[in-house]
C-alpha cells in the first residue's frame, strides 16, 4: 500500500536548492569562459574535434 512521504523541512529544501544552484552557476561560468576563449581565438587550452 502506498505511504505518503514525510514533509521536507524548509531548511533542508533550501539547502538542496542552494547546492543545485551553486553547481549550475559553476557550469554556466565555465561555459561562458569557454565561449569567450573560443570567440577570441585562444584555443591553446582546449582540444576541439574538427
UniProtKB/Swiss-Prot annotation:
GO terms for cellular component: large ribosomal subunit; plastid. Disulfide bonds: none annotated. The keyword Phosphoprotein does not apply. GO terms for molecular function: structural constituent of ribosome. InterPro entries: Ribosomal_bL32, Ribosomal_zn-bd. Keywords: Plastid, Ribonucleoprotein, Ribosomal protein. Pfam families: Ribosomal_L32p (PF01783). GO terms for biological process: translation. It is found in: Plastid. Transmembrane segments: none annotated. Belongs to the bacterial ribosomal protein bL32 family. HAMAP family: Ribosomal_bL32. This is Large ribosomal subunit protein bL32c. It comes from Euglena longa (Euglenophycean alga).
Amino acid at each position: 500500500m502506498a505511504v505518503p512521504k514525510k514533509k521536507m523541512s524548509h531548511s533542508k529544501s533550501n539547502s538542496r536548492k542552494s547546492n543545485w544552484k551553486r553547481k549550475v552557476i559553476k557550469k554556466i561560468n565555465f561555459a561562458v569562459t569557454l565561449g569567450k576563449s573560443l570567440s577570441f581565438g585562444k584555443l591553446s587550452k582546449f582540444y576541439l574535434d574538427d
